[in-house]
């Protein structure tokens, strides 16, 4: 079943340079004084929220349930000249990132409200398993 989250042709219609700048400012403020060099977004979507991290020197990685969103994110990253690792997987089962650890792991956007409370706990446990010691969830 298709959803808005697979409609990459319309998903980013409201995104523009103003939003990009706002996200970049947000991340700069949020991460100021933090030792965050690697960041995993487990619901990266088209990348609009977290791609600006690349401009701040953060090594970004991302995953998403929607392969269409991963494709769109790859296109946007390539167009901006960013090399990021992207994988298609569900944030409730992050085995696609097995063996990797990140300074910060997050689920950006509006993904967590789409699953029940037990699944939120599962997702948070999965995410926490990928956070480096002293890192951020």
Question: What do the PLM-derived regions correspond to, one by one?
Answer:
Residues 103-118:
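A short SAM/SAH-binding and catalytic strip from SAM-dependent methyltransferases
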Residues 96-104:
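A short acidic, Gly/Pro-enriched loop at the edge of an enzyme's catalytic core
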Residues 121-133:
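A short glycine-rich, Lys/Arg-flanked "PGG" loop and its adjoining helix->strand segment in the class I
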Residues 50-93:
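Class I SAM-dependent methyltransferase SAM/SAH-binding core
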Residues 1-34, 36-45:
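Conserved class I S-adenosyl-L-methionine
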